Amino acid sequence: MGRSLKKGPYCDPKLLKKIEKLNQNNEKKVIKTWSRRSTILPQMVGHTIAVYDGRKHVPVYITEEMVGHKLGEFAPTRTFKGHGHHTERSTALK
């Protein structure tokens, strides 16, 4: 279920403050954040935000198509390595 339109999109106040500061100074720095739940806003376009995935910070370059989505959508928390493979021992037991 989505967030109420009356409330508006949620963005971490600290993250928003850092973005506004960089926009005023026309700087492009990587911003580290742990706030995966923050919604991507139009003023974030063009910045690189390092989103924490539980292990490391994943750099995410923000484009116009990402506006309205959450930061966590672009930093997967699980890495799928594939299902188990047959080994020589397991095939010999048959």
UniProtKB/Swiss-Prot annotation:
Give a GO cellular-component term: cytoplasm
Q: List the Pfam families.
A: Ribosomal_S19
One Gene Ontology term from the biological process aspect of the record: ribosomal small subunit assembly
> What are the record keywords, sorted?
Ribonucleoprotein, Ribosomal protein, RNA-binding, rRNA-binding
Q: Which GO terms describe its molecular function?
A: rRNA binding; structural constituent of ribosome
InterPro entries found in the cross-reference section: Ribosomal_uS19, Ribosomal_uS19_bac-type, Ribosomal_uS19_CS, Ribosomal_uS19_SF
Q: Where are the transmembrane segments?
A: none
Q: What does this protein do?
A: Protein S19 forms a complex with S13 that binds strongly to the 16S ribosomal RNA.
Similarity annotation: Belongs to the universal ribosomal protein uS19 family.
Record-linked PANTHER family: RIBOSOMAL PROTEIN S19P FAMILY MEMBER, SMALL RIBOSOMAL SUBUNIT PROTEIN US19M
Q: What is the designated name of this protein?
A: Small ribosomal subunit protein uS19
Q: Which organism is it from?
A: Caldicellulosiruptor saccharolyticus (strain ATCC 43494 / DSM 8903 / Tp8T 6331)
What would be the name of the gene that encodes this protein? Answer: rpsS
